[in-house]
Structure formats: C-alpha cells, structure tokens
Amino acid sequence: MKLLNLASNNSFWRGIDYHHENRIIGWKELAENCYQGKVRGSGNAVYDVTIDTAHPRKSACNCPFAEGRRVICKHMIALDLGIFPEKEQQMMDYIEEQNQMYEQEYEKEMQEREEEIREYVMKLSKAELREKLIQRMINDLYY
C-alpha cells in the first residue's frame, strides 16, 4: 500500500474513480514489483504509467501533473488498483480504522474539556457566575 499512502488526497480518490471507470487500457509486469501500463485520462489522452511498488517514488507517468516529478498521480493509483484490486479494500479498512480512532480521540477530548468547564464553573462564586452569564448574553447580541 506504499504507493497509495504517498498519493495526495485528490490523486488517491481520483485514482479510485479511474479504476472504477475501467480506464486502464492494459498493463504488463516488467520485473519484480515493476509494472507498466496505459491509462486513459481526461478526454482522449492516454498516459504511459510505470509503477514500482517496492520504491513508489521511482514510479513515473507522462501526464502533466507527474511528468518529470517524483509524485504519485491518479493514473499511477488507477494502475496499481487495476493490478492489485485487493489494495482498495485494505486501504478503505485502514481509513475506517483511522476515522474511528480520530472519533474516539475527539470524543475523549470533548469529555475532558466538558469536565474542565464544569470544574471551573463550580468554583465560581454566585456573583462571578452571574457576571459571566451577563457577558455571554451581551456577546450573543452582537454575534
């Protein structure tokens, strides 16, 4: 999944779209971990794509975005998924796992913050509490 991990968010999702749209015209294995193929791009353009799954930064494509640069483009992603379709599900599982971890961390942070607020408010005197409430209500008038 190295190649997929190195792609920008946009290249990754567009590459998945290209894979689903069957834009891979053909491919062949050049050597172990090295593949060459043709991917149909926008309009009638067809791009020559070479991917090296062991060394993704050695991958190449002659599209305007990637030509002469060491970046991962949507055509490389499409070719990689065309050759190894199981990678898509693995990546989706990984993304889901990361989202769940993020949501759990966010929920924990919110609970901690809520507890801090409760503790702070409970320490305020009645007069301080009234003043904070008045300030907030006045603030809300303008925002």
Show the residue positions of the predicted features.
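Long, low-complexity, compositionally biased intrinsically disordered regions
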Residues: 1-143
